[in-house]
From Swiss-Prot:
Transmembrane segments: 119-139
SUPFAM superfamilies reported for this sequence: ARM repeat, Sec7 domain
Residues where Phosphoserine is found: S411, S420
GO BP terms: actin cytoskeleton organization; endoplasmic reticulum to Golgi vesicle-mediated transport; Golgi to plasma membrane protein transport; regulation of ARF protein signal transduction; signaling
Protein's UniProt keywords contain Membrane: yes
Domain SEC7: 541-730
SMART domains in the cross-refs: Sec7 (SM00222)
Keywords (A to Z) from UniProt: Cytoplasm, Golgi apparatus, Membrane, Phosphoprotein, Transmembrane, Transmembrane helix
Gene Ontology MF terms: guanyl-nucleotide exchange factor activity
Protein name per Swiss-Prot or TrEMBL: Uncharacterized protein C211.03
Localization: Cytoplasm; Golgi apparatus membrane
Annotated organism of origin: Schizosaccharomyces pombe (strain 972 / ATCC 24843)
Primary subcellular site in the record, as a coarse category: cytoplasm
């Protein structure tokens, strides 16, 4: 069966019957009472209880006769015991105590507690029983008569009396008393206790805490209970109506006095009647409790020890923590805090007692967090003193790892000691300490406590911002925010531990990081001001206020040196409205405390400034003040000069205005003058340390000095006695010139007077002021953080500092502030040691294969891999740069130079650069260090001789020494760090920069126009014997800058002045090409130029400025004979598609020529370029260049074919398969190249009027010369392609209209000379027999040419005869060389020609005897043919069928109409 669980809200909580539980407690207490000697004979009634007879058994006098021995009843002799018995009897028959009277239930227990005849043990039992009643909710909020029972209970426990026998038992009683008081406030009584009860409870609790005779454990326990009690008391402030309190509550009466540690409340004695109507406690008791707590820490009273004061401070802190800002809503409590409490705290913080100082600082910190709006002046005084205590007199030392410029920045933040004994403004540390009349150097432990206090304040979200807004921008206040930052900055440096403890630097660092954290936190949208439109107005107001303050400070300093100059300066800046108006001048004197008291006194007492003196004194309110009080008020504002004449001048004016304010105080102003002078003399007499006490002026002496000056009468002696006493006890001083308690009290009174006229403390609730404050403080904070970074040795410090710097840069970026981001980048660049001034040379760089990759080991990579600080700096550097690229301004050159340094040492590759993704190139002109194939040198193992041997052998092989394993590991660490830094992401995302950051980067890149000096700023970095190193640096810089410039220009989507930027970038690139001698770099730069000209926004024309730049590029490439790479060729090809006129220009053709002459790999690109050239539009010189390019292209292809054949031949000898496809591809390329000759022939139109004499000057002749020259090549493939091309060109030419002379010129100037050259040149070679086919092909071409152009040649038969004889001569020569049997193709060709000529009648045959009309030359031609040709080619006669031919001829002669023509 499941047992039902009790609900937590059920009453009571005990599992047994509540009546039984109470009865058990009664039995326990009564049993303990019976066992005592005094109560041992209490009788059976204490056991059986009290019962009465029923009515029917009672009779008059019967009951009295039943009493034993005539003794008194036990109820009379032992009423306390009988009361317990009566309660037990009453509860015996009750199953539940709901609705039972709580006062009746507690009454016997309370009487026992108050009884002085009870032992401590019995009292302790009663207290425990009551505690149990509350714990088990036997007494709860619903109990009847609860308020009265709680009032009686509080009275009982505060009046607890018992017989003391055992000290430990006594303390147990007190422990339970304190526990029960705590339960009263925490339990059901918290809502019904009266003001008097609260005061009684707190008074009792404080008494227990302060009794030194009690054990330390009991006092600690009582303190814990008091802490809990005070929490509940001051929690009530949240629910009390503020209107129940009044600021005028405190008066001079004893009842409402703000002084004294005694409680002021109506105390109830044993015989007093307690009213049934009780009001719950409220502001009255809370105010009284707080007043007593404050009185415990009164600095002027030495009644309490430091430990008691420390305890009171803890109680006060508890009250402030619980009540929070609500406590400032009550005027009387606010007065108590702002005056009495703060004055005591500001005096206690000078203590060296650890507990007292700790708790004083804690209370002040809690106050500033709970109610800063009411403590503006007190907060200034407090923080100023703390700053002065943390001042380090020495300058910042120079650490080994700290860069000079950084050290200068940090050193500039040191606060100098400004000792100016006559200045009223608390600007120097000495003067700040005087506010607490403390000129000692605080111990190290005290400095640590002060830093911890400032650290707590730094965790207030708007603390620094509120300081700046309320103090730094207030002309009358100190620069608390700036000074606080300076002192924290100075103390966060490691050397400050010499003046304090080792914990101070990290504590100060933590405070600075807190400030940065809250700046960063306020960037969240929830902190935005809903009235964001007024943010600019607020910022403008703050800036103007800060400027005004600076002017006032400068004017005051100038006044202290020269009053006239100071007034003129202040008038010029409208601080003093009119310099000739004494009222305006005096208003300034009274409005600032920055003037020197001495200088002001000298200025006012000058005779020429009497009108200003009158205006100055008239501004004081002397009404109702005694003359010494008025004089004290006046002389606090300036130092009275020592000359009697000047003193008299001041006192005469003072007397006049004093009598005007107090006409009834004395008879005349002369009397006031004499009395004032006497008071000054009395003040000097009483407080001059050089006068012995026996010779000091007495009251009688003072009265005698002023006898009869009051219009012939004496002043009242009591009046003079009060003056004498006031002067004797309190010297008239200028407070800032003394270090006494009196000076502090004066300054404090002056502060209280200034509270009413001081602007209220402005507490921030949004980030409206953050930007202005951050702009003012960022440099000091970041300088400190970076300084710590440079000297830190622990990982935690590194990471905290880095996190702080990251947050600071995020804040700067959010407010679009360039300088903080640039500052961080500049410093971290220095930490990486990759800046130009510290980069080592690259002469010893060596490449080595590690696993499956090749790495470059350099001095830079090894050094960087060893330096953890440098690696972390690199990570942070590129985190900042990547995230806030749009904010970077002046640090772009550093980032570019760092990238160049990495590239120079092969620590990044082309994939890092934006051009890699944007342009798709696969190669970049990085340095190529020698590849070291040896094993790593010994690093730690191995002897000196082996290491030396390895070193020398490496130089003998003309290579750097092989790197050690350790160096390789450091290099790998460097590579990993660079990869983690994500430099590639940073560089590739540069194209996404917004304006104006994009223009700033472009300007920075263009400024690096002289690479030989831009990176080598340190003379020591350049070795005169290593000029090549400088050139290498120049080359890599040029290439990287060019990549960035081109990528930014072409990859950005931002608006640019494209015309201007394009010209700048192209000019830069051309300049670098002109200066560079490295072909790889020039190629890469030319690639970028081609990319620039491919821009869609560029409209290139021959009259534009860009055309001149393009022409310059082409000229440079030609002049330097640069091998143009394939990607550049592809871009040029695209450019040609976009601007076809490029190939019609001499510039474009020159570029093509340069590419053809130098490039040996990109045949397709070259062919496409050449094929696009419109040869018909080229003039003759350009045409010659074009054909030369085709010729060179053909030669290149032939060389490649030869190389392939050679490789395949070698492969065949090794049994490797023959790849015919490669050879076929190149053969196709060769045919395509020859087609370019044909293309030129096709596009060229022959002038039909052109004579044969001009043939050699025509383009035909140029084309034939190139093709025929190639026909003489020893390469079979080249000869075959050349002959094929030649034949097609001939056909193409003859297909166009022409004269016979043109044809004959073709034969005699081109074909036949070529044939002769082939016979002559090729026959001379040893392997001439293998060229027979080529000669036969050439002869075949000539014969075909005759046949093709027979229609033209037939008209000039004489020319045909000559041509035939020449052909016959060639055929004979070929037969003599190769034999007729091997020249079948020649014989076939000559036969065809013969038949055509013979058939056309151009050549006579064997029938010439038949026709006597045939000319002699035909007969001669035939005879020559018969006698020569048929001798060498006898088969030819049979093939030609001469006899049949003769018969046919005869028939033709008979029938001329049937003559056949060709």
């Amino acid at each position: 069966m499941e047992v039902p669980r009790a609900s937590p809200n059920q009453e009571p909580l005990c599992s047994i019957s509540p009546s039984s539980l109470v009865i058990n407690e009664i039995i326990t207490v009564v049993t303990a009472i019976r066992k005592t000697t005094r109560w041992r004979n209490s009788g059976v009634a204490s056991i059986l209880g009290v019962s009465t007879l029923k009515d029917e058994f009672l009779a008059d006098g019967l009951e009295s006769r039943w009493k034993t021995n005539g003794e008194k009843s036990s109820s009379i002799r032992y009423p306390l015991v009988m009361e317990f018995s009566q309660l037990k009897e009453d509860l015996t028959n009750r199953a539940s105590l709901n609705g039972y009277d709580s006062l009746k239930l507690l009454s016997p227990f309370l009487r026992t507690i108050k009884s002085p005849r009870m032992t401590g043990y019995i009292t302790s039992l009663c207290l425990s029983a009551i505690l149990k009643f509350f714990s088990f909710r036997i007494i709860s909020e619903e109990s009847p008569n609860l308020a009265l029972s709680m009032r009686n209970l509080s009275f009982a426990i505060t009046q607890c009396r018992f017989e003391s026998f055992d000290a430990s038992q006594d303390e147990a009683v007190l422990l339970r008393v304190s526990r029960l008081m705590e339960e009263l406030l925490r339990g059901p009584g918290k809502a019904v206790l009266s003001d008097d009860s609260i005061c009684e409870i707190v008074e009792t609790g404080l008494s227990m805490c302060c009794q030194s005779r009690l054990s330390q454990v009991l006092r600690y326990s009582a303190e814990l209970s008091m802490t809990s009690i005070l929490e509940k008391i001051f929690e009530r402030l949240k629910y009390i109506d503020v209107k129940t309190d009044s600021e005028d509550f405190w008066d001079a009466s004893e009842e409402h006095s703000i002084k004294g540690e005694e409680f002021h409340y109506k105390k109830i004695t044993e015989g007093d009647e307690i009213s049934n109507e009780i009001d719950p406690f409220g502001i009255g008791s809370i105010r009284e409790v707080f007043r007593v707590l404050v009185s415990f820490i009164d600095f002027g009273k030495q009644k309490f020890s430091d430990n008691i004061k420390a305890m009171a401070l803890r109680f006060i802190n508890t009250a402030l923590e619980v009540s929070g800002s609500h406590i400032s809503d009550f005027p009387s409590l606010r007065v108590l805090i702002t005056d009495t409490l703060c004055k005591s705290l500001l005096q206690l913080i000078r203590s060296d007692h650890t507990a007292l100082l700790t708790n004083s600082l804690l209370v002040m910190t809690t106050l500033l967090q709970a109610m800063p709006g009411s403590l503006k002046l007190q907060q200034e005084l407090f923080i100023s003193y703390l700053i002065s205590c943390l001042h380090i007199p020495s300058t910042t030392p120079r650490e080994r790892n700290v860069e000079t410029s950084l050290h200068k920045v940090v050193s500039s933040l040191d606060l100098s000691e400004e000792i100016s004994p006559d200045r009223a403004t608390p600007t120097s540390f000495t003067e700040r300490k005087r506010f607490a009349f403390d000129t000692r150097n605080r111990p190290p432990e005290v400095r640590e406590l002060i830093v911890e206090c400032l650290g707590s304040l730094s965790r207030i979200p708007y603390f620094l911002i509120d300081l700046y807004v309320n103090y730094d921008c207030d002309p009358q206040m100190s620069d608390l925010a700036i000074d606080l930052l300076k002192v924290l900055t100075r103390n966060c440096l490691v050397d400050s531990a010499r003046y304090s403890t080792a914990n101070v630097p990290p504590l100060c660092l933590d405070a600075l990081l807190n400030f940065i954290y809250y700046f960063h936190e306020h960037l969240q949208p929830c902190y935005n001001d809903p009235n964001n439109t007024f943010k600019d107005d607020v910022a403008k107001t703050l800036i103007e206020s800060k400027k005004r303050k600076a002017i006032i400070i400068e004017g005051a300093e100038l006044f202290n040196e020269s009053p006239s100059d100071g007034i003129a300066f202040l008038t010029q800046h409208s601080i003093i409205k009119q310099s000739d108006n004494p009222t305006c001048i005096v208003e300034f004197f009274h409005s600032t405390n920055r003037l020197s008291k001495r200088v002001l006194g000298e200025f006012l007492t000058k005779g020429s400034n009497s009108h200003i003196l009158n205006a100055f004194i008239s501004a004081f309110d002397f009404k109702g003040k005694r003359i010494d009080e008025a004089l004290r008020l006046l002389l606090q504002s300036f130092r009275l000069p020592g000359e009697s004449q000047l003193i008299e001048r001041v006192l005469e004016t003072f007397s006049h205005y004093y009598m005007s304010a107090n006409p009834d105080s004395m008879s005349s102003k002369d009397a006031a003058f004499v009395l004032s002078y006497s008071i000054i003399m009395l003040n000097t007499d009483q407080h001059n340390p050089n006068i012995k006490s026996q010779r000091r002026m007495t009251l009688d002496d003072f009265c005698r000095n002023v006898r009869g000056v009051n219009d012939g009468q004496d002043f009242d002696r009591n009046f003079l006695s009060e003056i004498y006493k006031a002067i004797k006890e309190n010297e008239i001083i200028v407070a800032e010139e003394h270090d006494t308690e009196l000076s502090f009290l004066y300054i404090w009174s002056k502060l209280q007077q200034s509270v009413k006229i001081t602007e209220p403390f402005k507490r921030s609730s949004s980030n409206v002021h953050d930007k202005i404050v951050f702009l003012e403080v960022w440099k000091s904070i970041m300088a400190a953080l970076i300084y710590v970074f440079s000297t830190a040795t622990e990982d935690t410090v590194f990471y905290r500092v880095v996190n702080g710097i990251q947050q600071a840069t995020e804040v700067a970026a959010a407010y679009e502030l360039n300088e903080p981001v640039d500052y961080a980048i500049e410093r971290f660049c220095q930490f990486t040691a990759l800046d130009p001034s510290s980069v080592p040379g690259t002469q010893l760089n060596t490449a080595i294969k590690v696993e499956d990759r090749i790495i470059t080991v350099s001095e830079l990579s090894v050094r960087f891999g060893r330096d953890f600080r440098a690696q972390l700096a690199l990570l942070v550097l590129f985190w900042i740069s990547s995230k806030f690229g749009n904010i970077i301004d002046a640090s772009w050159p550093l980032l570019v130079q760092l990238t160049i340094c990495l590239a120079r040492n092969n620590l990044i590759d082309n994939s890092f650069l934006p051009g890699f993704k944007l342009f798709g190139y696969q190669w970049f002109p990085f340095p190529e260090p020698p590849l070291n194939s040896g094993k790593p040198a010994l690093s730690k193992e191995g002897g000196l001789l082996s290491a030396l041997s390895s070193y020398l052998s490496s130089y003998a092989n003309d290579e750097p020494p092989c790197p050690t394993d350790e160096e390789i590991q450091h290099t790998l660490c460097t590579i990993d760090c660079i990869s983690s830094a994500k430099i590639d992401n940073f560089l590739t995302k540069l194209v996404d920069l917004k304006q104006p950051g994009l223009n700033k980067l472009l300007d920075s890149l263009l400024s690096l126009s002289n690479p030989s000096t831009s990176l080598l700023t340190d003379e020591n970095t350049v070795d005169d014997n290593k000029v090549s190193s400088v050139e290498a640096l120049s080359n890599i810089q040029s290439a990287i800058v060019a990549d960035l410039l081109t990528s930014l220009f072409l990859g950005t989507r931002e608006s640019l002045n494209k015309l201007e930027r394009r010209t700048q970038i192209l000019s830069y690139l051309l300049f670098q090409i002109e200066q560079s001698g490295d072909e790889k770099v020039i190629n890469q730069l030319s690639l970028y130029i081609f990319e620039m000209f491919m821009d869609d926004d560029l409209k290139l024309s021959e009259n534009s400025e860009d055309w001149g730049l393009f022409s310059k590029l082409c000229n440079l490439l030609n002049d330097k004979n640069i091998v143009v790479r394939n990607q550049s060729l592809s871009l040029f090809h695209q450019l040609v598609n976009k601007y076809p006129f490029l190939l019609e220009s001499w510039i474009g053709l020159q570029l093509v020529q340069s590419a053809v002459n130098t490039n040996t790999a990109d045949i397709d690109d070259l062919y496409r370029l050449l094929s696009k050239i419109p040869t018909n539009l080229l003039d003759l010189p350009m045409f010659q260049v074009y054909l030369g390019c085709v010729d060179t292209l053909i030669q290149t292809i032939v060389k490649q074919i030869a190389q392939i054949l050679s490789k395949q031949k070698k492969g065949a000898s090794k049994g490797l398969p023959f790849d015919k496809s490669i050879l076929d591809n190149h053969s196709a390329e060769l045919n395509d190249a020859f087609n370019l000759f044909l293309k030129a022939a096709v596009e060229y139109k022959v002038d039909s009027n052109e004579s044969s004499e001009h043939f050699q000057d025509t383009r035909w002749k140029i084309i034939y010369d190139h093709v025929c020259k190639l026909c003489l090549s020893r390469s079979r493939s080249l000869r075959a392609a050349s002959l094929s091309c030649l034949q097609r060109i001939v056909v193409e030419q003859l297909d166009q209209p022409h004269e016979v002379s043109y044809t004959m010129a073709l034969f005699h100037l081109v074909l036949l000379p070529t044939m002769e050259n082939m016979i002559t040149v090729l026959t001379e070679k040893p392997e001439h027999k293998i060229f027979g086919l080529a000669q036969a092909q050439m002869f075949n071409i000539i014969c075909k040419t005759v046949l093709i152009d027979m229609n033209v040649l037939s008209a000039q038969k004489e020319m045909l005869h000559t041509l035939w004889l020449k052909l016959m001569d060639v055929a004979i020569k070929l037969s003599s060389i190769h034999g007729s049997e091997s020249m079948a193709e020649v014989m076939e060709s000559i036969k065809n020609v013969f038949m055509i000529l013979h058939g056309a009648g151009a050549l006579a045959g064997p029938t010439i005897e038949v026709d006597p009309e045939i000319p002699d030359h035909l007969i001669k031609t035939w005879n020559t043919t018969w006698n020569n040709l048929f001798i060498y080619y006898p088969e030819l006669s049979n093939d030609l069928n001469i006899n049949n031919e003769a018969e046919m001829k005869k028939e033709n002669l008979k029938n001329p109409s049937q003559t056949t023509t060709v």
